[in-house]
Curated annotation (Swiss-Prot):
SUPFAM superfamilies linked to this entry: Diaminopimelate epimerase-like
Keyword set, alphabetical order: Isomerase
A Pfam family annotated for this UniProt entry: PrpF
GO molecular function, one term: isomerase activity
InterPro entries recorded: OMA_tautomer-like (IPR047687), PrpF-like (IPR007400)
Record-given protein name: Putative isomerase YbhH
Family: Belongs to the PrpF family.
Amino acid sequence: MKKIPCVMMRGGTSRGAFLLAEHLPEDQTQRDKILMAIMGSGNDLEIDGIGGGNPLTSKVAIISRSSDPRADVDYLFAQVIVHEQRVDTTPNCGNMLSGVGAFAIENGLIAATSPVTRVRIRNVNTGTFIEADVQTPNGVVEYEGSARIDGVPGTAAPVALTFLNAAGTKTGKVFPTDNQIDYFDDVPVTCIDMAMPVVIIPAEYLGKTGYELPAELDADKALLARIESIRLQAGKAMGLGDVSNMVIPKPVLISPAQKGGAINVRYFMPHSCHRALAITGAIAISSSCALEGTVTRQIVPSVGYGNINIEHPSGALDVHLSNEGQDATTLRASVIRTTRKIFSGEVYLP
């Protein structure tokens, strides 16, 4: 049987396989077949692979040394679909980004400095650039630490991620429809593309409080059908075309915060509710809190830049927004995440 080197890592509130691009075929079709075999795609439990039967654990990060002078490494994210044999490389994944720097250092793609190594990452999916500050005392990656993130038990070393050019990652525009508010099925929404194209929907317009647990929302098939109808219309309006076989745009239900944050959210991936919150989605949501005229601003009257706390089913996530320019195209977003190396070895291919 053929085998390739593989590292399994938790990145933020996601988990997946980290692979070097040199160990995979350049042909996309052949590459995707290998990724599906590794994860066990096409089975609800992903029983024949290392995927966990959930979108949050059926992810792959493909890493290589970058040819772009603005980056040290290239990172291609692959969402391996659980229930069908398909791979989507359209979006970025900010949680998996948390492990890219450590993986790159430990695989010799960039030399470590002490006490912190800044790894410049180019996300191949979106063309965006991210800086990851990895704890490397004495030139060695440190995984243990005191940082805690909601949705993950225990503590670990902090990884600071700064998104340098998040505006219009897939569509070229912050507001791809040229409107701050659009109406689909008579529901007001905001379509925004900051790190991730999302369609933001006030929960009350779908007959929900927005505080329901993910399992309750996932069981409501009528709700999921309404969300998908809005998502498909939003995708076309955002210039993404027919998104029925794409995981973007991601739908987000919003409601007033309950625990002192700026906003409460339920983030969909896109057909099931995230147990916490995607980093890229959090950047889009926080941007909608700061920018005028959005449906979010009808709930959050005034936030501005700085730290924006977003409540989600597992707790909350802080995004720090800064802007040295005059409009949203120059927004920078920073988050603190953690990562853990779970195993390093070889994965066998059927």
